[in-house]
């Protein structure tokens, strides 16, 4: 990204971390000192998880670089303040916060452009990944919260996977998968065959079983 933006004479004016997982809070020193925002809840989770997140950076992260977890600021409202986004004065960039994948996770909705940046939600290469072990209800609530902006979006960009101009298909696929798992049915979802998703599916089935058992007791 550094080389790509430099070749096009683009300047980083701000950043938004959708949630407190290490791969979504990365930062390159050459991006400069642009403001970096996240939700207050995500910042709280960063404080609680920091040791683990630092370990997850691994040996590939240059030791001489500043920690990417330093310098993040909590949003004071459900919108990104200027100077984030130089596309035009007053362009609204609204956050849609939920706890579906991680506490304080937020999508970023650029309504004037019809673009939804979904973070670790609504992927075509990952199953729904609720916060293990007991936040499946929060994930269902997250899909409900996202539904309105997904319906308006022309383009959806997930944190992992491919952008799509058919956002509702992603939402429908996740709901259909979770409906099957919650009902105890075999979920016919091709994403189960992808790397790491077999284990993820087993965990989701475990969560759904615990939820059903709790509701019936």
Predicted regions: what is each one?
Residues 2, 27-30, 50-51, 130, ...:
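Short amphipathic alpha-helical segments
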Residues 1-41:
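Active-site metal-binding motif and surrounding structural segment of the metallo-beta-lactamase
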Residues 40-44, 122, 183:
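Short, acidic/turn-prone active-site loops that include or flank metal/cofactor-
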Residues 10, 34, 91, 153-154:
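A structural micro-motif
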Residues 148-155, 162-217:
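Accessory terminal helices/loops
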